[in-house]
């Protein structure tokens, strides 16, 4: 299952919250998830009893009624690196000029903890460590911060208690206490792999990271009205505490905007908007260990996620999307969750009064509609296409005075500016059909040949 949350990061107002698959309010007992139905079908085929099937169906039904964003715990993974980074910057144990070294793993108290990159990242700046989401670098940052300070900030960012949202059934977190945290636990906690939190707790913490450092209480109900429509109660913003300084918050906004602008979160990039964010890809290590112990099966499952905020220079909203155990070939947060964030922001931000402002570079690369130039002489057609940002290639002699008989792509097609439009002059367009060869599995150069 997946869930998403959108919050006003300054007030705590929850603007949207959803879990999918959901259920039909008119028929809540009906299972809607195809995966749940498949599970029951497989159990039936394997010879499960009616009692076993009924018990499983009841369990699945109860699960689909849950609000995943507030009731279910998960390892936040690399999204949590935002917390570690902000804490370390606030304590001044790291700076933007700090460097770290990744040899593809880090040895901690005799335990080898691997980076996701089997080749290692080498020497990294703090910005590069966040952008490349390097685990060994964050282990080193966690060590510089130390157990006590790490636990102090873990608590200050709200992870040791429910957020206090005005919804029933909110869960608390499951975390390693200060007393039980050793070097290995600190190391894995630093990159979000040991402590389990709710998606809402992670969203609320990210709000504090980008809003100037203030931990706010999330809420759903904005106001209450009586039967005559009079306002009888209004929810006021509740600030629990300031966790980090405005200066640290500004640094974090800059770091996370760079993540989106570069390779780490490019799938969340939107032309005309300044977006900051961080991806996460969590190993469900507890389920892996249980499955291996009970069946001997060696199979890891994942929880991809992406957290983002906008606008990066003046944050108004924070969004978190997470997908629990996706079934496709992709399981990285940047590939699975980031495109969802991008799509929602692109459509939703204008409704909040946040409109795009395009840079010259973005304008130069944006898609544009190909104008109609059929019947025009070559020079006039080329001038019109150039004015719209397109290049031109002729089939035929442009000096012959012949007019454009065919244009490819056709007028009205939306293509990136800078693309080439092919103009066929006079009778140069060959209407004969041809068989398109099969280029499946070939490289681009092979296909072109």
Language-model-detected regions and their locations in the chain:
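Ligand-recognition elements built from short beta-strands and adjacent flexible loops
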Residues: 235, 272, 286, 311, ...
């Amino acid at each position: 299952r997946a869930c998403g949350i959108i919050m006003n990061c300054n007030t705590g107002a929850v603007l949207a919250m959803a879990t999918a698959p959901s259920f039909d309010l008119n028929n809540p007992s009906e299972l809607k998830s195809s995966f749940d139905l498949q599970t029951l079908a497989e159990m039936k085929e394997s010879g499960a009893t009616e009692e076993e099937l009924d018990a499983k169906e009841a369990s699945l039904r109860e699960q689909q009624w849950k609000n995943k964003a507030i009731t279910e715990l998960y390892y936040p993974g690399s999204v949590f690196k935002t917390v570690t980074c902000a804490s370390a910057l606030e304590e001044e144990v790291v700076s933007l000029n700090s460097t770290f070294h990744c040899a593809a793993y880090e040895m901690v108290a005799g335990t080898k903890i691997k980076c996701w990159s089997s080749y290692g990242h080498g020497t990294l700046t703090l910005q590069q460590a966040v952008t490349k989401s390097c685990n060994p670098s964050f282990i080193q940052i966690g060590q510089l911060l130390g157990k006590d300070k790490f636990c102090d900030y873990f608590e200050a960012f709200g992870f040791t208690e429910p957020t206090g949202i005005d919804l029933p059934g909110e869960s608390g977190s499951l975390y390693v206490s200060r007393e039980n945290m050793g070097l290995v636990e600190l190391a894995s906690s630093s990159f979000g792999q040991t402590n389990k939190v709710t998606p809402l707790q992670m969203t609320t913490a990210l709000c504090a990271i980008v809003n100037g450092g203030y931990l706010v209480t999330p809420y759903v109900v904005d106001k209450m009205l009586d039967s005559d429509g009079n306002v009888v109660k209004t929810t006021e913003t509740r600030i629990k505490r300031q966790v980090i300084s405005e200066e640290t918050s500004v640094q974090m906004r800059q770091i996370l905007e760079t993540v989106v602008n570069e390779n780490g979160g490019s799938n969340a990039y939107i032309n005309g908007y300044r977006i900051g964010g961080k991806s996460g890809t969590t190993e469900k290590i507890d389920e892996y260990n249980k499955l291996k112990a009970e069946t001997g099966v060696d199979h890891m499952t994942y929880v991809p996620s992406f957290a983002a905020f906008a606008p990066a220079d003046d944050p108004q909203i924070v969004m978190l999307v997470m997908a629990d155990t996706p079934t496709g070939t992709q399981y990285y947060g940047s590939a699975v969750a980031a495109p969802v964030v991008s799509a929602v922001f692109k459509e939703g931000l204008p409704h909040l009064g946040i409109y795009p402002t395009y840079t010259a570079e973005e304008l130069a690369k944006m898609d544009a509609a190909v104008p109609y130039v059929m019947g025009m002489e070559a020079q006039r057609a080329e001038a019109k296409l150039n004015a719209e940002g397109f290049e031109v290639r002729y089939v035929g002699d442009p000096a012959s005075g012949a007019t454009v008989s065919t244009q490819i792509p056709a007028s009205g097609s939306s293509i990136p500016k800078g693309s080439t439009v092919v103009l066929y002059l006079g009778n140069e367009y060959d209407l004969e059909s041809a068989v398109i060869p099969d280029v499946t599995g070939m490289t681009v150069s092979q296909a072109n040949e």
